[in-house]
Amino acid sequence: ISVFAGTNDYNKARPIGSFYTEPVEEKVIVGYDGEEPRYGTRKHRDLIFDTATFCGSINFVLGHLRTLYPTKPIYLMTPIHRAYAKFGGDNIQYDELYANSGGVFFDEYVETVKKAANVWACPLIDLNALCGLYPRNDTHAALFFANESTDRLHPSAGGHKRMAQAIAHALRAVSPYDHE
């Protein structure tokens, strides 16, 4: 199972949010071998499943996948780099060097996917770094993206091939599972 997330969340300015709340609870903090227990406060993490945020959406999806497919490996993939795309008068998407309408830069979504891999114990395939696609470069845009002038967001067949090669290599390198 693979989850490839982040680019549409960036474009739609979905707030990053947090993976957890951290309420403070009173707990037994000391109590050994017949001693009277002593109480104190400790922060505790509770996962957030609010799909209004990027982190909450990731938690929601991965929570369901872990429940529905407990024996299957789940791989998280970072989004590839992105650049200018114009799909019509009301659908213009800027490149990753611009913050989205919420003031958040693209690389923050990339880093959030990386963090999610650790939160959910999922192998990470960092396509943002591994596949070598960089649509802000004119030569790369011409070779590996749908249209050098209007779509530096979606890979061409050549771009998909590079992504597939990176994924195949990463699966061999990071997979701790038997593949059935």
Task: Map each language-model feature to its residues.
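Structural recognition of the beta-strand scaffold that forms the well-ordered cores
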Residues: I1-A5, D9, P73-T78, P123-D126, ...
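The substrate-binding groove and active-site-proximal loops of carbohydrate-active enzymes
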Residues: G40-C55, L97-S101, D151-H154
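Oxyanion-hole/transition-state-stabilizing segment in secreted/luminal serine hydrolases
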Residues: I1-A52, R82
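Catalytic His-Asp segment of secreted/periplasmic serine-dependent ester chemistry enzymes
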Residues: P79-E180
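A short helix->loop->beta-strand "cap" motif at the edges of active sites that frequently abuts
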Residues: T67-P73
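Generic structural signal for well-ordered alpha-helices
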Residues: I58-L62, V110
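Conserved active-site region of classical short-chain dehydrogenase/reductase
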Residues: C55, N59, K161
